[in-house]
Design a protein with these regions (language model features):
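FAD-binding subdomain of flavoenzyme oxidoreductases
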Residues: 102-104, 115, 120, 124-252
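Anion (oxyanion) recognition and catalysis
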Residues: 67, 127, 257, 319, ...
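Residue-level detector of anion-binding/catalytic polar loops
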Residues: 70-72, 132, 262, 324, ...
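C-terminal substrate-recognition/cap domain of FAD-linked oxidoreductases
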Residues: 28-30, 240, 245-437, 455-458
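Helix C-cap/helix->beta junction micro-motif
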Residues: 68-69, 129, 390, 448
Length: 494
């Protein structure tokens, strides 16, 4: 086994001293996630990965070295939900230097980028050609595409088009032994035709590297499907329902997904807007006092005729269920109009900066913890009621904890639901309330068969693995085939 000094010396030889760090402050900064303090394991060494103008980099060399000496290794993008925390120490690869947008093909409507490319930058490049990713996120430049594919990236457009992983046409992946493979459309790169579809001559293996938490290989390139769309084609609406209308909300969402006319529906509750309304960011005089559920809805329409048809159908469904149109939220918390309120506009208008709901909430509360999972829309009312009851029992159903829901309705008649709780990480009593609540959520969620998206599955106890049955054994066998020394993000799968 090599000493730490020997490991550092070899890494310095591969990438240069400037790109290798063992600074304790760097370790803490790179280790933490959005749930600061939840994962305390630190990397032994941080390596900054950078590519040159021709796309050359040293990832394969680093992996060969790490594999030979059985050194754990994780790849990190921006901040994340915990999957890039180095549970076993070892090497942490900072992928942000592999950030090139390699090709935008307007004719074939795809984009090829390096695995560390900012999703924000990909959108910017696409918009120069009247294109965008069908699923666009609401975040700033820190989020990278490789991480989004590795751990179920989400964004607006899920109601019509699905996850970021559903946009993947091809991948270039570097395996634990340093071998580079191209999958899907990228297997056709270099031919006369070039990339054009995910299906090739062999079985589709893209799924091995999507939602895999970096445990099967390091994503070095991605090829993503884009759609023709200008920002002016996206039209924003918000309908509000009372707390006792959740059953009607559930039925409306199912009907809208079935009709396939809505581009996106974002489901939130009043807790998300409590502090923004108190600060005057949103005028609460223009929002019903009894409004509890907010359905932020986006329509994609290329012309007035298409918009009229889709808008009429959407309004009929919401209004017949008792919903109330609230332009105040649509104008100030959604889309291009929100840019007029500050410098933090599309595509991260509703989260980042002083004009975002999250910035406003944090000023009055503290750090937040979040659970993220998927389940069928027809269980929305049951799951919301269970979460509210758990939060009340734990003493966190109040403005000080802002126990909000922030969820995406998907094309699979499902909801990608995030339960938030804001808390004081330096108050043991508050942390105790948080842990009790998270345990209750884990129990009732596991019992019903949710699909967890964050934090990593290994934090969710034995029930999800038991439900997978022999499939989990097969996945472990595949992992052992491509990474026999289990150096890639150990602990993520086993």
């Amino acid at each position: 086994m090599l000493s730490l000094d020997e490991i550092i010396a070899k890494l310095t030889e591969i990438v240069g001293a400037r790109r290798v760090s063992t600074n304790p402050i760097d370790k803490i900064n790179y280790q933490h996630t959005l749930a600061y303090g939840a994962y305390r394991a630190l990397p032994d060494v941080i390596v900054r990965i950078e590519s040159d103008g021709d796309g050359n980099h040293k990832v394969a060399d680093i992996l060969k070295f790490a594999n030979e000496h059985k050194i754990p290794i994780v790849a990190k993008g921006g901040v994340g939900m915990g999957i890039s925390s180095p549970l076993k120490g070892g090497l942490l690869l900072d992928m942000l230097g592999m950030d090139k947008i390699l090709e935008v093909n307007p004719a074939m409507q795809y984009v090829i980028a390096e695995g560390g490319a900012s999703v924000y930058a990909i959108h910017h490049a696409l918009r120069q050609h009247g294109l965008m990713l069908p699923n666009f996120g609401t975040y700033g430049p820190a989020v990278v595409i490789g991480a989004m594919i590795n751990k179920g990236g989400i964004g607006y457009g899920m109601t019509r088009y699905g996850w970021i992983a559903d946009m993947v046409l091809g991948l270039e992946v570097i395996l634990a032994n340093g071998e580079t493979i191209r999958l899907g459309a990228l297997a056709n790169q270099g031919t006369t035709f070039g990339p054009f579809q995910k299906w090739i001559h062999l079985p589709d293996l893209l799924g091995m590297f999507t939602l895999a938490a970096g445990s099967m290989g390091i994503i070095s390139k991605v090829c993503l499907r884009a759609i023709e769309c200008w920002r002016e084609w996206l039209h924003d609406y918000c309908y509000v329902f009372r707390r006792d209308q959740l059953q009607q909300v559930q039925e409306s969402l199912i009907e809208l997904v079935r009709g396939e006319v809505v581009y996106d529906i974002h489901f939130t509750d009043r807790w998300q807007y409590h502090w923004p309304m108190e600060e005057g960011l949103y005028d609460k005089r223009k929002i019903p006092d009894d409004g509890w559920f907010f359905l932020k809805t986006v329509l994609l329409a290329r012309d007035a005729e298409e918009l009229a048809f889709k808008e009429k159908r959407m309004r009929r469904i919401y209004q017949s269920a008792g919903g109330v149109d609230v332009p105040e939220i649509a104008d100030k918390a959604m889309g291009a109009k929100a840019q007029e309120l500050g410098l933090h506009g599309w595509p991260d208008w509703h989260i980042m900066g002083p004009d975002g709901w999250c910035g406003t909430v944090v000023r009055h509360t503290g750090m937040f913890a979040v659970t993220s999972k998927m389940y069928p829309l027809r269980f929305l009312k049951e799951m919301y009621d269970l979460d509210e009851a758990a939060k009340r029992e734990c003493g966190i159903w109040d403005a000080a904890h802002s126990p909000q829901h922030d969820s995406y309705v998907t094309r699979d008649f499902a909801i990608k639901e995030e339960y938030f709780t804001f808390y004081n990480p330096y108050d043991d009593e508050d942390v105790g309330k948080l842990r009790k609540w998270m345990g209750m959520v884990q129990q009732f969620s596991n019992e019903r068969g949710v699909v967890w998206t964050a934090p990593t599955l290994s934090t969710k106890g034995p029930i999800p693995y038991q439900r997978l049955g022999s499939l989990y054994d097969v996945v472990k066998e595949i992992k052992q085939l491509v990474d026999p020394n289990n150096i890639l993000n150990p602990g993520a799968l086993y």
